[in-house]
UniProtKB/Swiss-Prot annotation:
One of its GO terms (cellular component) is respiratory chain complex III. It is a multi-pass membrane protein. The chain crosses the membrane at residues 33-53, 77-98, 113-133, 178-198, 226-246, 288-308, 320-340, 347-367. It comes from the Eukaryota. The keyword Protein biosynthesis does not apply. The gene is MT-CYB. Belongs to the cytochrome b family. Binds 2 heme b groups non-covalently. GO terms for molecular function: metal ion binding; ubiquinol-cytochrome-c reductase activity. This is Cytochrome b.
Length: 379
């Protein structure tokens, strides 16, 4: 008799995705981040669900309800900090996952890659709206500044901003709708992740060499299930260490002050994972130009497959491209640092140079270098 997992309509899907899936025999630790992102999403949905049971999305009580969760709810402080720092772990895994895709040419799977870019936008939107919910100073002013950027859109801008706010400023209506969206988006993200996997399993996984691995496949279980479990344990170790030893390390002290529309914080800045995009936004003196650069800094990922000029898929055997890739990583770290600094000399010029280099590397320097490497193959 055939095994039930191979015949049952539901178990058959799980079996073909996580058990009998033919996987390349040489995929490295960089391929662990997909499963880690799945774990992060589950952690966020579960902790978020328990937080939503005690949270109230009203400007008068939101801040107090978060305080109540931390002080009076059983292990409320743990749930709250797991959720807040879980977002940071989520973004660390996301950035490493995208970086892996860029390095090893995984973007050649167009549908998988484009859904991944869409997922990145969805996760960023969710995180932004979640940051508004505690209704601290940085929540309020972050929401005001970022939503105000839409006013740069010609003709419909100011109407659009008021429509999103549900009034003439960030207020009760804004908080309520942000909570509603913050609650529903993770489930949309989960559905998109399912589609992401569906398209990935159509073509099969890429591998470090960038060559076809059809001749050398191994079953996903037990080889990669055990490898993924190790990754998950390390992720949980990192997350719990952060939560139990320094839960406020990545947060902003201003967010422990109740939102006050009459008092602007000296430095308005988003969470650390948005700082690189925020630095690009600030480096352009024009409002509309800044907004376009902000959107393009992420949207540029969708263009990457069309800029692939190399005869090789992966960067594994392309030393010049490798060098440029790590320059790009250093550039993004520089932008992250600049995003957290005040708008003054020398940070302004460093931010502008780093922003120009970011776009130049992806759009011009890397494709040209790939062409040069193609010529090296002939020698």
């Amino acid at each position: 008799m055939t095994n039930l997992r191979k015949t049952h309509p539901l178990m058959k899907i799980v079996n073909s995705s996580f058990i009998d899936l033919p996987a390349p025999s040489n995929i490295s630790l960089w391929w662990n981040f997909g499963s880690l992102l799945g774990v992060c999403l589950i952690i966020q949905i579960l902790t978020g669900l328990f937080l939503a049971m005690h949270y109230t999305s009203d400007t008068m009580t939101a801040f107090s309800s978060v305080t109540h969760i931390c002080r009076d709810v059983n292990y409320g402080w743990l749930i709250r900090y797991l959720h807040a720092n879980g977002a940071s772990m989520f973004f660390i895994c996301l950035f490493l996952h995208v970086g892996r895709g860029l390095y090893y040419g995984s973007y050649m799977y167009l549908e998988t890659w484009n859904i991944g870019v869409l997922l990145l936008f969805a996760v960023m939107a969710t995180a932004f709206m979640g940051y508004v919910l505690p209704w601290g100073q940085m929540s309020f002013w972050g929401a005001t500044v970022i939503t105000n950027l839409l006013s740069a859109i010609p003709y419909i801008g100011s109407d659009l901003v008021e429509w999103i706010w549900g009034g003439f400023s960030v207020d009760k209506a804004t908080l309520t709708r942000f909570f509603a969206f913050h609650f529903i988006l993770p489930f949309i993200i989960a559905a998109l992740a399912g589609v992401h996997l569906l398209f990935l399993h159509e073509a099969g996984s890429n591998n470090p060499s960038g060559l076809s691995s059809d001749a050398d496949k191994i079953p996903f279980h037990p080889y990669y299930t055990i490898k993924d479990i190790l990754g998950v344990l390390l992720l949980i170790l990192a997350l719990t260490s952060l939560v139990l030893f320094s839960p406020d390390l990545l947060g902003d002290p201003d967010n422990y002050t109740l939102a006050n529309p009459l008092n602007t914080p000296p430095h308005i800045k988003p969470e650390w994972y948005f700082l690189f995009a925020y630095a690009i936004l600030r480096s352009i003196p024009n409002k509309l130009g800044g907004v376009l650069a902000l959107v393009l800094s992420i949207l540029i990922l969708a263009v990457v497959p069309f800029l692939h000029t190399s005869k090789q898929r992966s960067m594994m055997f392309r030393p010049f491209s490798q060098c440029l890739f790590w320059i790009l990583v250093a550039d993004l770290l520089t932008l992250t640092w600049i995003g957290g600094q005040p708008v003054e000399h020398p940070f302004i010029i460093i931010g502008q140079l780093a922003s120009i280099l970011y776009f130049l590397l992806i759009l011009v320097i890397m494709p040209i270098t790939s062409l040069f490497e193609n010529h090296l193959l002939k020698w």
